[in-house]
Amino acid sequence: MKKIIITATFLLVGGLIFAQDSAKDKSAIDAQIDAIIYSWNNHNYDDLKNYTTENTDWVNVVGMWWKGRKQSQYAHQVYHNTIFKTSVGEKKSVAIRFVTKDVAIAHVEWHFYGGDTLPDGTPPRTKDNPNIDLATLVFVKQKGKWLLEAGQNVHVVPEAQQFDPVKQMPKN
């Protein structure tokens, strides 16, 4: 009986410690997401090295795939010197889950508006009618710091949401 109580105590304490670490890690990842948005809103990506790995990949909403920190920084900066130079990004929601203790996936809904007319003639979005985007971000913990390893951003098309088959999926 004593062994059962000791084992149960260790499991309970271990679970509490993991929960505390998990909350701390979620907070650290959320802070890195804020850093990404800070770069966007300041239109300066000199700080990209503070929240990405050297091998970070980014796939943007039109399928451009930037491989490594150098390409990611360069491409983001080019667009923020041109069509996004006055755009604004706002984080709306974040869902984080851990794949391992050192790998996490974050799904971020963020809204973007402002900027210049796009190359195809599309006028900039307004705060009342922003682009609604959903990003999938993969973070890895390196030397105690959470860094973006890969990200992909897609536009959410509100008109298509009614056709999501999951909305008709049986509940049981």
Regions found by a protein language model. Give the residues of each.
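A short gly/proline-enriched turn/hairpin at secondary-structure junctions
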Residues: 57-70, 80-85
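Short, low-complexity N-terminal intrinsically disordered segments enriched in polar/charged residues
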Residues: 17-50, 54, 167-172
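Surface-exposed, charged secondary-structure patches
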Residues: 74-125, 172
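Hydrophobic pocket/interface hotspot
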Residues: 36, 47-49, 56, 68, ...
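Bacterial Sec-dependent N-terminal signal peptides
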Residues: 1-23
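Membrane-spanning beta-strands of outer-membrane beta-barrel proteins
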Residues: 89, 131-132
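A mature extracytoplasmic/lumenal domain signature
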Residues: 52, 62, 108-112, 152-153
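Low-complexity, intrinsically disordered terminal/linker segments enriched in charged
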Residues: 120-121, 140-143, 147-172
